[in-house]
Structure formats: C-alpha cells, structure tokens
A protein has these predicted regions:
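Bacterial carbohydrate/catabolite-sensing allosteric modules
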Residues: 1-65, 71-320, 324-325, 329, ...
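A secondary-structure capping/hinge motif
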Residues: 327-334, 376-388
Length: 396
C-alpha cells in the first residue's frame, strides 16, 4: 500500500526540448508520474537559455529533476535547497569538493557506449578506426573515447582521434575545415565514432563537401539516436540508441523516494546503451575489392525487393562461382547470407522505429507473407517480431 499523500508534490523539470535525448528523458519522467503521481509539474519547453526555476515567491517546490547546462541554473538549483536529481552532470559537478557531488544522479554508462561502438566496427571487419569528440572538458566524451580506443587497441589496431579546440576565438567554420582536412588524411576505409549525433552530422557534412564517399571510405556512427538529426543527415546517420526513457523513469522514481526520505542523498544510478540503429552512414562493409563494394550497394538498394543470388550475378555480369569465392574471401559469408542479413536489418529498423503493422513491413521488405517473414526473423534472432518490438521499440 502506498504512502498516504496530504498534498500534491510540486516538481520542476529543467530539460531543454531541442534534443531528442532530453525529450526521451522527459517521456520517462512523465511515464513515472502518470503511474505513481500525481505531481504538479513546472516545465518550460525550449533551449538551455529557457531553463530556469521560478522565484520562490511564485513556486513552492518539493523537488527538481534537471540537466544543468549553464551557471544560472546551477546557482538557482543550489539555492533552492530541495530534493534534486541531476541527470548526466558535467565533470566539474561530480568532483568531491563541489556541492553537487552529494546530490542524487542518473548518468549514462559512457564506457559501455564506447565499447559497443568499437565492437560494431570490429564486427564489420574494419582495420582503421577514428574518434571525433565534442567538448574536451566533457567527461562523458573522454570516457567514450577511452573505451572505444581501448577495445580497438586490444585487437592490435590504432585509433586516430580528433577533439575540437574550444578556445577563445573559436569559430565553427574553421573547425569544420580543420575536421575535413583531418578526415582526408585518415587511412581508408575507416570507421569513425562520433561522441554525439551532432558531431556525426558535422562529419558527414565535411565528407560531402570534401568529396569523401560515405560509407565506402568513411563510415560514421553517432550516439543518442536523435531521429530528426539522424534521418535528415546526408546520408542518414547510424547511431547508438541510449535507454533514455528508462533513465528518465529512474530519475523520477529516485526523486519520489528522495522527497520522502532525504537520507538517500548521493545515490548514483547508471543507464546503458540499448542498441545500434543502422542507417546508410555505416551500411557498406569495408573491402578493397570494388566488385564486392558494388555488389553490397546493389543488395542494399534492393533490400525491399525479393532479390536473389541469380539476380545479383546477372546484374554484376560475372559467374556465380567467382562472385561467391570473392565474397567468402572478402567478407567471410555467402551472397545469400548477406542478402538475408540486410533484409533482417531493415525489418529490425521498421519494427523498432515505426508503428507499421507487420504485414506492411513484410511487403516493404520483399516477403510474400507476414508468416514467412516471421519464420525467417525468428530463425535469425530467436524471438518473434512482436517480442522484438516490445523489447526494442523506440516508440514505447
């Protein structure tokens, strides 16, 4: 039986809505309060400049959930002296001498994010690796770099790194040109891990303007899976989806407990990456064999058609035996296995990122029936499509 309430808790949520990351966190917070509230919520949509607490005369608050991005919010939260949960606090806020170090926190597991990115490129048989960071003072970015570089190094490979110079007089255009020059010098093909999606878009733009082919020469993977940013990139950006909605839910749950028991201060909860959402920026498996690259591109653009090995051999104008041998030598799989892999990836993407009925997905992926697609899907992943959607959907 829940604790009897005598009044509705007043909670301020300071999260900018310009990022998919923070919107997903907000969804999780609202989900918790809908189940366990009600709360009286104070929230202002907008960017970081719009995030501020109302005056104490206007608002008698009981709790705060916040992502602090400027000093004004920092000072207002400190002076509020009410139960607060910090989400992904900056490095300066978690050093033992800072008052925020004693606050409850929900943090992303940046080491696991970096490891996931490295494994992703290694499984695609890359031999060249690079990392592009965001602000050098952001600990989460450095942690992602350390983990990514560490896994790559353990496999005997070198990782090239680029970190922007945020100094006095910094200019975005100058940084873009410097980034483009750096990308040109990288050994190709190369798998590039961007600390966040915004950086991933900048890499793609620099490649486009410099005539660097994506993904044939440079494959790019971001973090956050901000769908608007990723889908409007050229080409669309692959990204690591984080469990942000669950993080928001846990932040709200932690605040609820904290408002009832202030002795919980200092509790830290971490949330993990969920999965990699594959888009065109990483769709080509690296190979020095131009025939293989062209074949993979043909398979990709026909992922919604019931294309078979004979169709591919005819299009490439080469004997099946020769193409199969070069495929096996270059990629370690058969042509049919690659066709099936690409189709499964498309099914997974449509299941996770849309609410389309399964029979519509079957049509879009070149299957004659939903039932046959379901059999193929279960053979590869060991679960039904409904089970997969329930577990991985970005829309839930």
């Amino acid at each position: 039986m829940g604790q009897i309430r005598t009044k509705i808790p007043q909670v301020a949520i300071l999260l900018e809505t310009t990022h998919g990351y923070s919107r997903n966190l907000l969804q999780g917070i609202l989900k918790y309060q809908n189940l366990h509230g009600p709360w009286g919520i104070y929230f202002e949509p907008g960017g970081s400049a719009d995030q501020k607490l109302p005056s104490k005369k206007e608002w008698k608050g009981n709790g705060i959930i916040c992502w602090i991005t400027n000093q004004e919010v920092e000072q207002s939260v400190l002076s509020a002296r009410i139960p607060t949960v910090l989400i992904d606090p900056w490095e300066e806020y978690i050093v033992p001498t800072h008052p925020f170090s004693k606050y409850c926190q929900v943090r992303g597991n940046s080491h696991e994010i970096g490891k996931m990115a490295a494994q992703f490129f290694l499984e695609k048989n890359f031999k060249n690796f690079a990392f592009v960071g965001d602000h050098p003072e952001r600990k989460w970015g450095r942690d992602r770099q350390i983990a990514f570089t560490g896994v790559v190094s353990q496999q005997g490979y070198r990782c090239y790194s680029y970190v922007p110079e945020f100094q006095e007089g910094y200019e975005a255009e100058a940084d873009r040109k410097r980034l483009a020059r750096w990308l040109k010098k990288l050994p190709k093909p190369v798998g590039v891990f961007a600390a966040i999606d915004v950086r991933g878009r900048q890499i793609l733009a620099a490649c486009l303007q410099s005539g660097i082919r994506v993904p044939q020469e440079v494959s790019v993977l971001g973090v956050d899976n901000d769908v608007l940013l990723c889908e409007t990139a050229n080409p669309p950006l692959s990204s690591i989806a984080l469990d942000e909605e669950n993080a928001g839910y846990q932040a709200a749950e932690l605040l609820d407990r904290l408002m009832k028991d202030r002795s919980l201060k200092g509790t830290v909860i971490t949330y993990n990456p969920k999965q990699i959402i594959n888009r065109r920026s990483t769709e080509i498996v690296p190979s020095s064999d131009k025939l293989i690259v062209e074949t993979l591109e043909f398979i990709r653009i026909n992922s919604g058609v019931n294309v078979n090995v004979a169709d591919i051999v005819k299009y490439m104008n080469i004997s099946r035996r020769t193409l199969e041998c070069r495929f096996k030598s270059s990629l370690g799989c058969t042509i049919l296995e690659e066709i099936q892999r690409v189709r499964i990836e498309k099914i997974k993407s449509l299941i996770c990122e849309t609410a389309l009925p399964l029979h519509s997905i079957a049509e879009m992926c070149g299957f004659d029936s939903e039932s046959y697609m379901g059999k193929v899907f279960k053979k590869f992943l060991g679960c039904s499509m409904i089970e997969y959607r329930q577990k991985h959907s970005a829309l839930k």
